């Protein structure tokens, strides 16, 4: 019973709220529209009533005058070119043509001499070709005689030797002459005597003639000092006398470093290398 008493007022209250909401909705639907009042502005064209200066209606401002084109500046007058060079050229051409004609006449007058000269040139070229073919491509090193006599003092260790020279040819028309001589011991220890002569020999490969030296006609003789240890190993190469051209000196030095020597003691070889063009 208590529960029913509590529910009845709540139901009544909710039903009342629903009726109020329905009434409010119906009231808003039947409302009349409210007309809003505002200021109205009208625009009037004053040009239809004529201008203030007495001109007819629609007459505007006067048109601006058209700009006149500027006159073109006068072209500079070119001075006349002098006519002197063609005359000089004609004279020169005439002189050269006359000289050529005179030379051709001289050559035609002596046909036998011209033929002889051409034949001699052909013969010289054929001889040079035969010489180049006869030369072997592999260059042999210059040999030194095995018996090189040495005379030295027992206290100082200085000696004098003699070596033979052999001519050789290089590449093409170049010739390189190499000869090897023995100077004696380096100065360490006792020197040799007549009863115990120093025996040493050696050879170096023929150095290649530098191409730039051949083109510039560089010739000369290089004297090298080659120090050889016991066993034939080249220890150092020095230039005693230069040829005057660094390329020739370097070529001779490289060839001496690759030389083959036979020595029982420290031996200094003097190697002259001659570069010449045939």
Curated annotation (Swiss-Prot):
Q: How does it sit in the membrane?
A: Single-pass membrane protein
Q: Where is this region: Disordered?
A: 51-203
Would the keyword Transport turn up in this protein's UniProt record? yes
Record's subcellular location: Cell inner membrane
Metal-binding recorded as keyword:
no
Question: What job does the chain carry out?
Answer: Interacts with outer membrane receptor proteins that carry out high-affinity binding and energy dependent uptake into the periplasmic space of specific substrates. It could act to transduce energy from the cytoplasmic membrane to specific energy-requiring processes in the outer membrane, resulting in the release into the periplasm of ligands bound by these outer membrane proteins. Required for heme utilization and virulence.
Protein name as catalogued: Protein TonB
What is this organism's lineage? Bacteria, Pseudomonadati, Pseudomonadota, Betaproteobacteria, Neisseriales
Q: Which gene encodes it?
A: tonB
């Amino acid at each position: 019973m208590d529960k029913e008493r509590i529910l009845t007022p709540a139901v009544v209250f909710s039903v009342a709220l629903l009726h109020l909401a329905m009434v409010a909705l119906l009231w808003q639907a039947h409302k009349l529209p409210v007309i809003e009042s505002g200021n109205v502005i009208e625009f009037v064209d004053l040009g239809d009533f004529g201008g203030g200066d007495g001109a007819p209606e629609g007459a505007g401002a006067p048109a601006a005058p058209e700009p006149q084109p500027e006159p073109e500046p006068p072209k500079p007058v070119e001075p006349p070119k002098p006519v002197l060079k063609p005359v000089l050229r004609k004279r020169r051409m005439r002189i050269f043509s006359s000289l050529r004609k005179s030379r051709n006449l001289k050559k035609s007058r002596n046909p036998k001499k011209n033929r002889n000269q051409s034949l001699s040139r052909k013969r010289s070229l054929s001889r040079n070709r035969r010489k180049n073919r006869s030369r072997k491509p592999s260059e042999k090193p210059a040999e030194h005689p095995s018996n090189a006599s040495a005379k030295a003092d027992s206290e100082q260790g200085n000696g004098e030797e003699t070596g033979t020279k052999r001519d050789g040819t290089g590449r093409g028309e170049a010739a390189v002459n190499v000869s090897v001589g023995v100077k004696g011991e380096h100065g360490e220890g006792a020197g040799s005597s007549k009863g115990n002569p120093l025996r040493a020999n050696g050879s170096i490969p023929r150095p290649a003639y530098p191409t730039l030296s051949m083109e510039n006609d560089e010739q000369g003789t290089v004297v090298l000092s080659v120090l050889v240890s016991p066993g034939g190993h080249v220890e150092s190469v020095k230039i005693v006398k230069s040829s005057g051209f660094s390329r020739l000196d370097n070529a001779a030095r490289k060839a001496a470093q690759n030389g083959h020597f036979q020595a029982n003691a420290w031996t200094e070889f003097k190697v002259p290398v001659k570069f010449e063009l045939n």
